[in-house]
């Protein structure tokens, strides 16, 4: 059987009891290592689980999934995912491949950023469509996701922005030349995401469009949600460009046009301090 097991968001101990029992009895255990990361390394997981883990990168999961599924019809294979197993469409593809091969599967869920984001005080049922913000390059600067942000705000819904992760990526030159040389990992920060959003706002103004978001739109930056050192900051989009949230992973929320008083009271707990150089009181937004 194929087991897809969520690891939660914090450290090795966030796995469920059920998930841990399965991991310890499986013949092979894979750790998916490209859609998200934990605050601890592979070695810490191996020590706590009492099992050796095989790191599965994007290439192996998306192009060589048969290796993961090998013998899963006659033995138990575990596929570990940070957060919840269905936080990425890649994992649905793995289930479909297993089904076509006649391999049974079972999912053991866990917390993901999609539900843990409620820690900031914004009500989960008031979130609209989630968007992804990717690293811009000199030749690729996508803005199309901003239409979804606009639609969410028109409907009074908050937008969760998932920020880009680059793990085991190749430069264009190395890719063209077929060299297996990889770039250092990169994780988008709230600062970088906010700066790109502000540039989109300026581009829309230049085109004569009315942007759905401005420099003063209330946003929430989150870092390492679920970890002991998680950090949350609430302030304007402009403030998000300079607020220090520390190490990855980061996420950004663009609030909807309508905020419930209880949501606002909760956000005030995370307001960027008045004495900060980039501060502005939430109550003044």
Swiss-Prot record:
InterPro entries: 4pyrrol_Mease (IPR000878), 4pyrrol_Methylase_sf (IPR035996), 4pyrrole_Mease_sub1 (IPR014777), 4pyrrole_Mease_sub2 (IPR014776), Dphthn_synthase (IPR004551). The keyword Phosphoprotein applies. It catalyses: 2-[(3S)-amino-3-carboxypropyl]-L-histidyl-[translation elongation factor 2] + 4 S-adenosyl-L-methionine = diphthine methyl ester-[translation elongation factor 2] + 4 S-adenosyl-L-homocysteine + 3 H(+). The modification Phosphoserine is found at residue 171. Transmembrane segments: none annotated. One of its GO terms (biological process) is methylation. Its EC number is 2.1.1.314. Keywords: Disease variant, Intellectual disability, Methyltransferase, Phosphoprotein, S-adenosyl-L-methionine, Transferase. It comes from the Eukaryota. Belongs to the diphthine synthase family. This is Diphthine methyl ester synthase.
